[in-house]
A protein has these predicted regions:
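Sec-dependent N-terminal signal peptides of Gram-positive bacterial secreted proteins and lipoproteins
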Residues: 1-10
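Post-signal peptide N-terminal regions of Sec-secreted extracellular proteins
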Residues: 9-123
Length: 123
């Protein structure tokens, strides 16, 4: 009898830094990261690094295709604070999208910026 085991790694789980600035009074309350290849149905990952005023922001993993950002399926929003590590459940790949991005929204009317790490797949 033989027993074996192994580790399965998701394909695109390298963290990439992103920075967003929000200013709701100027209509700048929403932004997206650049798109990245989403190779499997695993969770995405986000880690809050910094916020200029300590406020959180709202993050959602969305699909991306040749027409742009796609939100035509069930989306799951996450509140991200500095120091938070979140495995982002999503339905990007299940809905036929091969690329993903993080949709970021301000959680306050103030002018502030945030920095975070993210990856479209997780280990």
């Amino acid at each position: 009898m033989s027993i074996g085991g192994g580790v399965v790694w998701a394909n695109n789980c390298t963290d990439e830094y992103a920075h967003m600035s929000f200013d709701e009074s100027a209509g700048e309350y929403l932004d997206y990261t650049s798109s990245r290849l989403k190779e499997d149905t695993s969770c995405g990952y986000i880690k809050g690094i910094e916020s200029s005023n300590g406020y959180s922001f709202n993050a959602t993993l969305v699909g991306v295709d040749e027409t742009g950002y796609c939100e035509d399926f069930e989306l799951i929003d996450y509140d991200v604070n500095p120091g938070d590590e979140i495995w982002m459940y999503n339905y990007v790949k299940e809905n036929g999208y091969n690329y993903a991005a993080v949709k970021c929204e301000s959680n306050t009317g103030d002018d502030y910026s945030v920095g975070f790490l993210w990856s479209p797949d997780s280990v």
